[in-house]
Amino acid sequence: MKLNFKKQFTTLAFVTGFAAAASSSIAGECRVAEASMDKPGGFPERALTMIVPYGPGGGSGQVAAAMAEAVTGLTGVSINRDHKPGGSGTVGMTAYMAAPADGYNVLEHIDDASSAHALDSSRPNPAEDLIPLVISQVTFSQIYIRSNETRYTDWPSFVEWVQAQNGKATIANVSKEGSMERVIMKFITDASDMQIQQISFDKGAPRYGALLGGQVDALFEQPGDVRKFLDAGNFKPILTVFNERPGVFSDVPTHKEMGMDFEPLLRFRGFYVHKDAPADRVDWLKWAFQRAYCEDSYQAFNDSKFMNVIDSYRD
């Protein structure tokens, strides 16, 4: 198990380094020159299917809807989204790999695909089994509490309260051991000398509802995914897992400022196609998804989800 954890951390660190690589380009700048591209042999002649390995209410569901809208607006090609949550993405990945590799099926996935393979080499290897169309979101994580919480109001008081609960405190998180969220929470609890129960939710909406309804004491999530709760004043962040304070969260301390000496792992989300899809169809799909990233509708979506803090585009 220790070897698996080491392999998994190495994989996540590599992926994070790739996703966070510095870019001289401006976030949101369009880097696809071609405004149009001829369809190869008439492809696609019908709607595409996008398999989304998570529920519609979470970050993956939101970005899948936004990208599908942008691709359709650009090309006129409809995209049917097929949500298959479960196993932190493994259910959807299995379904996708069993679908025809004809270019009509595309996949939304996140960094969990890399960690799943790192933990179990029999799982699909994203670097070998998939072709990336576009990475369209790169973001950091935070820990949230209810805005009207009175037992603690900031990170130091939260840590003090958790330590006094003798392991009974709870935080809502994703369900899969070995995911980026679970790895970071282990780093945080070890560094802060906390024992906290991680309550598992594979879908975003129940996870957010658990904090809103008081079933858990805190929430681990990315800011864009809970934007509506932040805007409504329901949630507030008390810790940012990033090396510096983003301007939009300038009043929230980072894990580094709270004495934690680990490199933050970032969440990334993107779109893929099977490696065996016809090459000319892959080229068209790459153009369609990368150019769709430039569409006003998608840029407005990313801006609304704090995805302009880090340059989110990777081809």
PLM feature segments, named:
Residues 1-45:
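Short, low-complexity disordered leader/linker segments with a strong preference
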Residues 28-129, 168, 177, 190-220, ...:
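N-terminal (or domain-start) structured segment
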Residues 36-38, 73, 95-104, 117-206, ...:
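Hinge/capping helix and adjacent helix->loop/strand transition within the periplasmic-binding protein
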Residues 55-57, 111-112, 146-152, 174-179, ...:
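Short coil/turn segments
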Residues 111-122, 186-191, 217-252, 297-299:
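A ligand-binding cleft/hinge motif common to bilobed small-molecule-binding domains
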Residues 303-315:
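Surface-exposed aromatic
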